[in-house]
Amino acid sequence: GAPDLYFSEFTNATGWVHAGDKAIGGRLVKTDDETRLVAQLWGAVPEDMAKLAVHCKELGFVGIDINMGCPDASAVKAGGGAGMIRTPELAAEMIAAAKTAGLPVSAKTRLGYSLVDEWRNWLTHILHQDVENLTVHLRTKKEMSKVPAHFELIPEIVALRDEIAPDTLLTINGDVEDREQGLKIVADNPGVDGVMIGRGIFHNPFAFEHEPATHYRDELLDLLRLQLDLYDKHSHLTNRPFDTLKRFFKIYVRDFTGAAELRDKLMHTKSTDEVRALLAND
């Protein structure tokens, strides 16, 4: 199975405006066969957001998603990500700026900055901006991912959307591990239009399969080989060092005899060819 829609890594608009593609590390590289890809952008300067949104349209993205929920300290310090929750009027300006490119614009955010009770005022404000879709991560910025997502708030959030912006789609995010769980969330909460899976894919690379199944060593390692091939194919565009691949090894090298030892060896490799050689000899 595959997702119905994909989102790029979140990309800083101001960084791109001032330094070009080299500033964004290949985050907006798009191939012709990627036809359902939304560009997720962040920033705190409306003029820069407008410029990058136009560029994304030229690249062939099908929409713009503004990240107003990332808790990363550097993004928040710059006024972006979850920092937008503290500047609601600027958030509205960023959405309006993105719309000037003519693509559908959505927003991804959290319940609030520090307190869960912030959710009603904050989401009310965003829903008044006439976004195509609102994705709500069911935690605050302060909570990060340290507490369970507040699924109990979904019915109230649905009711708020229905009252203010019934045409805005509502997507739920946070602690959604796979397609099966996502479908249950939708079934249990009439009015929810979809779910977004983020970190879940790092725990289970088969998160989107329609029929959950047990996957064994060879299948997991073949997926790792595929990622190595894709890295080699696109590395001239993304310009990312080999070591950035290492954080993905644990996704595939797990849950089989000798996985820990193999993973340790892989962490000492210096090229994709070294990884392939280790896998071939293991």
Regions found by a protein language model. Name each.
Residues 1-58:
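Glycine-rich, positively charged N-terminal anion/phosphate-binding segment
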Residues 79-85, 143-144, 212-214:
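Short glycine-enriched, charge-decorated loop/helix-capping segments at active-site entrances
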Residues 119-123, 127-133, 152, 156-172, ...:
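Alpha/beta catalytic cores of nucleotide-metabolism and tRNA/nucleoside-modifying enzymes
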Residues 6-7, 40, 65, 106, ...:
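Conserved beta-strand positions in the central sheet of alpha/beta enzyme cores
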Residues 50-64, 68-78, 89-170, 189:
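Alpha/beta enzyme core
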Residues 13-15, 72, 142, 201-204:
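Short gly/pro/ser/thr-enriched loop/turn and capping motifs at secondary-structure boundaries
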Residues 9-10, 68, 138, 198-199:
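Short secondary-structure boundary segments
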Residues 21-22, 28-31, 73-84:
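An active-site metal/cofactor-coordinating segment within enzyme catalytic domains
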